[in-house]
Amino acid sequence: MVMNILTKIFGSRNDRTLRRMRKNVDVINRLEPEMEKLSDEELQAKTLEFRVRLEKGESLENLLPEAFAVVRESSKRVFGMRHFDVQLIGGMVLNERCIAEMRTGEGKTLTATLPAYLNALTGRGVHVVTVNDYLAQRDAENNRPLFEFLGLSVGINLPGMPAPAKREAYAADITYGTNNEYGFDYLRDNMAFSPEERVQRKLYYALVDEVDSILIDEARTPLIISGPAEDSSELYISVNKIIPHLIRQEKEDSDTFHGEGHFSVDEKARQVNLTERGLVLVEELLVKEGIMEEGESLYSPTNIMLMHHVTAALRAHVLFTRDVDYIVKDGEVIIVDEHTGRTMQGRRWSDGLHQAVEAKEKVTIQNENQTLASITFQNYFRLYEKLAGMTGTADTEAFEFSSIYKLDTIVVPTNRPMIRKDLPDLVYMTEQEKIDAIIEDIKERSVKGQPILVGTISIEKSEVVSHALEKAGIKHNVLNAKFHAMEADIVAQAGQAGAVTIATNMAGRGTDIVLGGSWQAEVALLENPNDEQIAEIKAAWKVRHDAVLAAGGLHIIGTERHESRRIDNQLRGRSGRQGDAGSSRFYLSMEDALMRIFASDRVSNMMRKLGMKPGEAIEHPWVTKAIANAQRKVESRNFDIRKQLLEYDDVANDQRRAIYTQRNELLDVSDISETITSIREDVFKATIDSYIPPQSLEEMWDVEGLEQRLKNDFDLDMPVKAWLDKEPELHEETLRERIFQQALEVYHRKEEVVGSEVMRNFEKGVMLQTLDSLWKEHLAAMDYLRQGIHLRGYAQKDPKQEYKRESFSMFAAMLESLKYEVISTLSKVQVRMPEEIEALEQQRREEAERLARQQQLSHQEEDSLNTGSPAQADRKIGRNDPCPCGSGKKYKQCHGRLQK
């Protein structure tokens, strides 16, 4: 009550914002005569003047009135179109990091040119985001003449474009593209192996068209780049053949023991290790199978993956037993859960182990699609420094825009008053009665010459209506969002007298339905039309336009209510553009999904009490209110789901940003030798500590285990036991220092063979490749954790907190694994000639190219888990700042340890 009184006195927040902006509109209007006096050259020179003023420290807000006045005057000269005052307000809203709700037909595309120009003056790039490729191309080409007149470059970012073309598109002042492509390019840039492979600049300003569709409807849809693992089934089969030739020995080879076998097994760690004898035999057998060349070593850089295959095959034969660890059913290897004994359909072991077991069991070897990178739209768009959007329907979702994206919604008034008649809903008992009533309504209105747009919630429903219209002999067009270019043509002509068009809710968004049809489309069919022909077409169109207005304008028929009021409002918004006449009505039945689930009992009882007969409809404000309440319930539930998903996904997002920041830092430096030395020290300290605990008695030392570990994991022959026997004074610290120094000397000798430059490149390549590999495995592990985390609720634990805690532990473990695997790989690679390193780099490049060709870009509807304030991309993290991964530790004590 009090709030209502205050609102009446002071106006709503929306009213106050519009009042403030109208003052700026007055300033722009006063500048108009001054701009009209300028020559084209003087008007174009304003762009350079604005840029100079920005460099001198003037703010964009100060420049706004002049910049908008320049764009308006340029638009008059280039397009013959003048921005309305409400479009200037829309442009200001978009510049202020807000959502502008502008009704259909109010000229959102022209409005967007204002903030796009203003923000492009910074030289940091403006990304205009559309829902499909057709609209991106259309808007870019339509607005290109205006921007180029003003001295700005325009780029189009489309799927399938080569990297140089994409780089050029992103280098433009204003880039048009789809939400999918911007997101995928971000992910691909964070998989690049050199700075030159990246295409995007730092993310500055995103202007999102149909913002409700992208930031709300698709919020639960992660962008996923998955690479089908290379088809190496033949290799698995060939390697599998050599395993029966190998003999097991009980103990690992050491200084005091040399067995006759070819491999030993560590049951506890579930690992297998080849002996020297085994290595020689495996190499011989691989040469015999034609997998390896004569004289090659299994440990040479180019054969690292082959060694991986041999180890996987050995583990499959020795450590994994049929009907214990797995079963074979219908030609498929299915894992058995070791704790429950239940089969785990759909789960697969990673690292090629599952394929090795399939080769062992002689069943079809399946390739796996591995998730290499993923991000949700929610988290991608929060990376932009400035984010704004526009749509015809945002007010119903204003709370979600505010709470998740920190974006306020401002309803921009229409240029002319809206006079569309929104008729009350009609509710029927059955679906068939409803369809019959719709057909009758269409018959009556099309005879009068009124155009009709029938909106359905699915392609299936549109086919039902289409079939009924065919049966009634009514000519019509069907749209179902498959062919965007053709769709726009049909929508443009849907305003012809008596035209009947069926469309799914999203089809044709972005294209206005012009009453009387589009005269521009008719002109486009003529070759080199002259002014007289254009005038004739316009005159004929004016007659048709007036006739359609007289018939009542465009009539919208909704065949059922959508879960979201916003989608219903979008459908209604196709009619009544720019103050035109129009009408709308929704036809419902008790068999509709929404009515059946949420409103059935109350409305059914009401209909029964009224004694309704077949074919009769109920039309009452109570019914409309009951339906609106049902929709609010669904919207609230969907919002809660999206909010909860975002809370979970923010954990992964913090980790993603940490990894991508480190990855980009790695890419941008040529020498990471200091980092390698630092993590080598950490790795050797941790390794030695696990066998020689700090400040422990010698009786507690496992010297033999340490020697084996150094040999197996780092290819270092160090007689630690002999040193201790010969030098009794050798204590824990001096021993640790000696091992580290000897490891360093061995590494430096390798470096002398190939040269420091080649070694630096190799270190960087190994670091990037290992990081990518572990991140990929971490994504899969996070996914598995997320799928089962809700069960913690039964143990009276908060699943969100448990997920955060465990995922951080997994992240910390991944960083430790990264250090260990990088040092292990660099230590084990046997380098003889610089050419071998180059061969490995070439192999890596070929693998990256293969992946780029095979990349499957998939939109995967998933309850992926994701809120929070907008992430400020590229802020330098101080060493004493809180770690961005959410652990609560300082950066230097968490994943910043890699930056030592």
Curated annotation (Swiss-Prot):
Induction record: Repressed under conditions of excess protein secretion capacity and derepressed when protein secretion becomes limiting. This is regulated by SecM.
UniProt feature, compositional bias: Basic residues: 889-900
Primary enzyme class: translocase
EC identifiers of the protein: 7.4.2.8
Gene Ontology BP terms: intracellular protein transmembrane transport; protein import; protein targeting; protein transport by the Sec complex
Cofactor(s), names only, from the UniProt record: Zn(2+)
Assembly mode: Monomer and homodimer. Part of the essential Sec protein translocation apparatus which comprises SecA, SecYEG and auxiliary proteins SecDF-YajC and YidC.
The name this protein goes by in its record: Protein translocase subunit SecA
Organism: Pectobacterium carotovorum subsp. carotovorum (strain PC1)
